[in-house]
């Protein structure tokens, strides 16, 4: 296996011209595309339709090349979009390809894909979703040809939140939901999928979990999960990244933990982890960085390093947007590239106030 990473600019959520150019130039083969992760310029909330628009645009393009329907494209390729390009964050997409290659003798970047069944509204944010995601993560782990959970550095999950239509459907059927607030369902949805990752990788014992734990007991978490929820999906899409001795190529992945949204040293440490170096963090070679994926979170109680912030009390701007803008600037100050995947909300993704970060580098 050889994984290719192609990061492209987007002028709007429907702009597929860069991918089309790569395909026409022979730099990307459509039948080798296995996943896409990107940022769109929506608000990231329950009424963010830029994500669905972007998926529709890319699936229409690829349908023409692959000779299948757009619907078949989305069943074959996970399209994971995070809405919200606040501050310096730039709308973009990272396309992942997978092809045959001889192992190098060293562990190299590997990718595994899995997609769950569709969920009923009453299953979102519950143990049912936890278990289904855990099973899918195990399948993605196998697909990535990784032998040890310690070699997994990043598990991206995108799943459904409760849209107004889903809430109404459950109401007609008398089904109980975790909440009837569409935006309020995001913590439950993100939390359940993150716990699914934690269970699959042995970070949390499933026997300790219950519906009452989700989005409440934050002492249960995964250190490598990066989960998002949107109204454009009814199932969960899992993209698992790690390093495998059965993979070829010249890419590696590493990860780290950001202590807060201004943790520059944490960014550098994640880059160093990917490079496999123990050098002084100030000497990290950022020119090797191919892609960065991180979560952003407001500080616990709104207090950042002893100083009060308004992230959690601002009635006009959601805290996730504050956090994405802050972390986007911090990471860009290190790498020099604002095309970063930064997603808000870290329920069961590292300890409260902390956040995961993963980096792919060329070696």
What name fits each language-model region?
Residues 1-363:
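Terminal domain-initiation and capping elements
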């Amino acid at each position: 296996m050889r994984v290719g990473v192609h990061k492209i600019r987007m002028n709007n959520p429907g702009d597929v011209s860069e991918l089309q150019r790569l395909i026409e130039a022979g730099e990307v083969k459509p039948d080798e595309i296995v996943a896409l992760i990107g940022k769109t310029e929506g608000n990231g909330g329950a009424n963010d339709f830029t994500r669905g628009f972007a998926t529709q645009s890319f699936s229409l393009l690829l349908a023409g090349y692959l000779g299948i329907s757009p619907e078949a494209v989305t069943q074959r390729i996970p399209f994971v979009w995070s809405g919200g390009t606040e501050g310096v964050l730039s709308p973009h997409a990272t396309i992942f390809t997978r092809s045959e290659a001889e192992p190098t003798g060293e562990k190299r970047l590997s990718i595994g894909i899995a997609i769950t069944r569709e969920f009923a509204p009453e299953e979102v944010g519950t143990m049912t979703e936890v278990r289904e995601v855990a099973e899918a993560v195990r399948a993605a782990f196998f697909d990535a040809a990784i032998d040890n959970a310690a070699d997994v550095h990043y598990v991206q999950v995108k799943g459904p939140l409760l849209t107004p239509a889903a809430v109404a459907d459950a109401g007609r059927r008398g089904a109980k939901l975790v909440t009837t607030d569409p935006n309020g369902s995001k913590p439950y949805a993100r939390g359940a999928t993150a716990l699914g990752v934690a269970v699959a990788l042995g970070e949390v014992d499933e026997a300790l979990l219950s519906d009452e734990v989700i989005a409440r007991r934050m002492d249960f978490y995964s250190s490598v999960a990066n989960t998002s929820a949107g109204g454009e999906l009814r199932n969960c899409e899992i993209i698992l990244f790690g390093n495998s001795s059965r993979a070829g190529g010249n890419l590696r992945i590493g990860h780290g933990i950001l202590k807060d949204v201004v943790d520059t040293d944490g960014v550098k440490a994640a880059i160093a982890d990917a490079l496999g170096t123990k050098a002084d963090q100030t000497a990290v070679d950022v020119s090797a960085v191919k892609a960065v994926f991180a979560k952003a979170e407001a500080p616990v109680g709104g207090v950042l390093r002893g100083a009060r912030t308004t992230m959690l009390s601002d009635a006009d701007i959601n805290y996730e947007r504050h956090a994405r803008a802050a972390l986007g600037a911090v990471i860009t100050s290190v790498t020099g590239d604002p095309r970063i995947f930064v997603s808000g909300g870290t329920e069961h993704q590292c300890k409260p106030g902390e956040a995961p970060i993963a980096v792919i580098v060329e070696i």
